[in-house]
Amino acid sequence: MNILVIKSSVNEKKGSYSSHLSDLFIKFYLEIHPEDQIEVYDLNQFGLANTNLTMKNFEDKTFYQKAESDFWINKLRNADKIVFSTSMTNFNYSATTKNFFDAITVPNKTFLLDKNTGKYTGLLKNIQNVQILTAQGAPLGWYPFGNHSALIKQIFEFLGAKVRSDFFVLDGTKVAPNNQKPIADFVAQRQNQIKILAENF
């Protein structure tokens, strides 16, 4: 089983809640499936982190080259399952995540459009499950219009992936008393939930 782990928080260097979630999830998963192949990618280490889609690079097609679109699409095609982590940034997923989805959402590569019927068909049907792990500073419900986790789920489903696992949101990271705790300690408080997700993945 090939597991593709993608980290897409902008806080990776100083410490990311969502990245800690991902690391803990993989730790539990490997305890159950030590034979599986794990590939981990921090999107911040690649060109797409600083390559956003614009009118110019869309028209001249350079966006897809600079963002290494084919590289990421091939990674997705070769994966059996995905673990995707990111944090909320200004009520949405990170700009790095947006760049990633722009790079992989490509007609005739990851989805088909029937122009006669308007029907879309996702092509990433090889992906058997996606575990979405996110973090946000506000408690759940403070910003009902900012459901970044559900949006990520819907995009993967649009592209043909199966998302059987419930997404997990580590919320309230910026409010007291949570913001007074070390990241690892706060994440550890939810480790039983993460372990169950890993067992069912």
UniProtKB/Swiss-Prot annotation:
The keyword Membrane does not apply. Pfam families: Flavodoxin_2. Its cofactor is FMN. Binds 1 FMN per subunit. Its EC number is 1.6.5.-, 1.7.1.17. Keywords: Flavoprotein, FMN, NAD, Oxidoreductase. Disulfide bonds: none annotated. HAMAP family: Azoreductase_type1. This is FMN-dependent NADH:quinone oxidoreductase. The lineage of its organism: Bacteria, Bacillati, Mycoplasmatota, Mycoplasmoidales, Metamycoplasmataceae. The gene is azoR.
